[in-house]
């Protein structure tokens, strides 16, 4: 894989830390800003909503911009939003900062996905996506637990400042990795925007996006509210939140690595194995959450299965959107973040009921069940190469 691809993954790691770090900070933010844990959890949905709106919008605006300038500008805007968020005492201002950061993240990821696809041959897109998404999984392994520890010791604001600072080496990497003159397809004779937007009418693309959104909704429903499960249900100390996040991240890294090698050639096998296992795993986690060893083991397993299944579906989005070279990345980003926005909202409705802290885990199982029910009648469609794929 080309070196620029790995340097893009460094930037994705910095941004991924921010996207996932709230899983360990929600109780602290709620206490500091005087809101409920459920309300603080909606910061994840606010971020995801910004990603949904920002991905296609910013990608469309950036079609004629040089890729390096676009990526660099997005990183710097992302850092600035975190600096402001770290200093605020207002929850609405913090929400606004998360939305702005999400818009910048969306623009970066949309352009980065398209750039990554352009750096490799067509039959290597799954592996290229795995390298890029490894930045997210490294964030869950190291960045998010590190942020949680920093938040435990110095408060959640220190974690926001740390993310802002970590963006600087990522910006330097983009500055050195991406040639200044490399523009998007729109500036080099690619299809017009209306043609790329027309790809959204393709049933195969819409199906892949829907399934990716449902699986990611299940992931974020549980991940956002994992901290209370670790401390209250399992009875572990606050530092074990970071351990759980490390295990989830390690699992996600393993899952996306294995799926990256299989999703180009054997997507059907990945979906057939990971889907049912993921469905069983969420209820199992809910029923065994009061047993620390079982809880931590299943957190690792669910991280692996969630990212294996999710990354394979997003690879299918990129394949199905082959006729939209500058917008394909935004479609994949939007699909991921529709799920990231919906998941915590669905999970928040289960808090305070008879299921208590375990409600989000049951909600995740329900979301995966819906995904499998939707996918089953179209199982051959989602894993069969589209005509555009077959000719590449």
Curated annotation (Swiss-Prot):
InterPro entries: MFS, MFS_dom, MFS_Efflux_Transporters, MFS_trans_sf
Pfam families: MFS_1
GO molecular function: transmembrane transporter activity
Regions crossing the membrane: 6-26, 42-62, 71-91, 100-120, 129-149, 160-180, 205-225, 239-259, 268-288, 294-314, 332-352, 358-378
Keywords: Antibiotic resistance, Cell membrane, Membrane, Transmembrane, Transmembrane helix, Transport
Lineage: Bacteria, Bacillati, Actinomycetota, Actinomycetes, Kitasatosporales
Name of the protein this chain belongs to: Chloramphenicol resistance protein
PANTHER family tied to this protein: CHLORAMPHENICOL EFFLUX PUMP RV0191, PURINE EFFLUX PUMP PBUE
């Amino acid at each position: 894989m080309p070196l620029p691809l790995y340097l893009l993954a460094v930037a994705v790691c910095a941004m991924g830390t921010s996207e996932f770090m709230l899983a360990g900070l929600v109780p602290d933010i709620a206490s500091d800003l005087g809101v409920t844990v459920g309300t603080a959890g909606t910061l994840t949905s606010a971020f995801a909503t910004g990603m949904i709106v920002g991905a296609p919008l910013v990608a469309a605006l950036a079609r004629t911009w040089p890729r390096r300038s676009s990526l660099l500008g997005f990183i710097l805007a992302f850092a600035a939003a975190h600096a402001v968020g770290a200093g605020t005492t207002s929850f609405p201002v913090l929400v606004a900062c998360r939305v702005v950061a999400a818009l910048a993240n969306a623009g970066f990821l949309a352009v980065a996905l398209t750039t990554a696809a352009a750096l490799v041959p067509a039959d290597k897109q799954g592996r290229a996506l795995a390298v890029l998404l490894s930045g997210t999984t490294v964030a869950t392994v190291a960045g998010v637990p590190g942020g949680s520890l920093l938040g435990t010791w110095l408060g959640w604001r220190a974690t926001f400042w740390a993310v802002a600072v970590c963006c600087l080496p990522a910006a330097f990497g983009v500055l050195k990795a991406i040639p200044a003159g490399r523009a998007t397809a729109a500036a080099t004779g690619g299809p017009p925007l209306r043609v790329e937007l027309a790809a959204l009418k393709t049933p195969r693309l819409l199906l892949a996006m829907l399934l990716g959104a449902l699986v990611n909704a299940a992931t974020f429903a549980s991940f956002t509210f994992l901290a209370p499960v670790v401390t209250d249900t399992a009875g572990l100390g606050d530092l074990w939140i970071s351990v759980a996040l490390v295990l989830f991240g390690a699992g996600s890294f393993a899952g996306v690595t294995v799926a990256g090698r299989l999703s180009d050639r054997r997507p059907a096998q990945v979906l057939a194995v990971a889907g049912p296992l993921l469905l069983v795993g969420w209820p199992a986690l809910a029923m065994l959450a009061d047993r620390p060893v079982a809880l931590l083991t299943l957190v690792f397993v669910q991280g692996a299965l969630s990212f294996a299944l999710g990354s394979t579906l997003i690879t299918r989005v990129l394949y199905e959107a082959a006729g939209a070279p500058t917008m394909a990345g935004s479609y994949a980003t939007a699909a991921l973040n529709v799920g990231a926005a919906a998941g915590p909202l669905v999970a928040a409705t289960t808090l305070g009921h008879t299921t208590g802290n375990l409600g989000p885990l049951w909600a995740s199982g329900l979301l995966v069940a819906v995904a499998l029910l939707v996918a089953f009648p179209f199982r051959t469609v989602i894993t069969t190469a589209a005509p555009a794929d077959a000719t590449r």
